[in-house]
């Protein structure tokens, strides 16, 4: 879009602004009212799409690496989060495991039942919220900085407010996992294949992108220079 949109920015800017605002609003409000983990993550992805589009709408070269970094950081955390969801199952009374425990209430006390899964999920949620020392923080900072540089200060302010609002449902789940009594019908299952390994890699990668983002940012900058 950076290459194709150059020269017609003013014509497509109103449409992009509308899409950005609508996606952030729908993702934020939808996520807040959810009581299902998978649906919460789905609405979260809508809000994050709005954040990414701020960088896309900036129409300058610095935004390219910011958007690429954001997508990599978000993708890493998303893969890990859905991996955790797949390993938290629901047990019916008097029966065996009946499926994934996607209801938020089923995640109460997960930190006591399986510290690894709960800890990894907390890392991914903190990254989604843009908390420092995670890849999500660096990604949001870079994209929002690119937006300000591109003259999109109003959108960035709205995005910061939306990001603060989305943090509510991320921290809600973290508090449920670590500060509430365990749910009797939620059962963390043993890793199937390399699921636990993948979750661990995603968690470590999410932290590394937040602590030492320089190597990836340098690589993306060189790749951008090569392509342009």
Across the structure, where does each feature detected by a protein language model lie?
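Alpha-helical transmembrane segments of multi-pass membrane proteins predominantly involved
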Residues: 1-228
């Amino acid at each position: 879009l950076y290459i194709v949109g150059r020269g017609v920015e003013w014509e497509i800017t109103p449409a992009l602004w509308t899409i950005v605002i609508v996606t952030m609003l729908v993702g934020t409000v939808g996520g807040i009212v959810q009581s299902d983990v998978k649906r919460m993550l789905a609405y979260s992805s809508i809000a994050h799409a709005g954040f990414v589009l701020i960088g896309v709408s900036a129409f300058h070269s610095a935004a390219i690496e910011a958007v690429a970094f954001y997508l990599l950081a978000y993708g890493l955390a998303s893969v890990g989060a859905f991996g955790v969801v797949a390993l938290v199952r629901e047990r019916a009374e008097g029966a065996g495991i009946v499926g994934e425990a996607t209801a938020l209430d089923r995640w109460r006390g997960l930190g006591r039942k399986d510290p690894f899964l709960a800890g990894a999920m907390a890392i991914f949620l903190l990254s989604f919220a843009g908390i420092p020392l995670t890849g999500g923080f660096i990604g949001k900072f870079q994209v929002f900085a690119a937006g300000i540089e591109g003259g999109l200060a109003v959108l960035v302010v709205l995005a910061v407010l939306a990001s603060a609002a989305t943090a509510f449902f991320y921290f809600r789940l973290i508090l449920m996992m670590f500060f509430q009594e365990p749910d009797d019908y939620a059962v963390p299952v043993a890793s199937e294949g390399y699921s636990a390994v993948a979750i661990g890699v995603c968690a470590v990668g999410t932290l590394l992108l937040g602590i030492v983002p320089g190597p990836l940012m340098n690589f993306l900058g060189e790749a951008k220079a090569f392509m342009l």
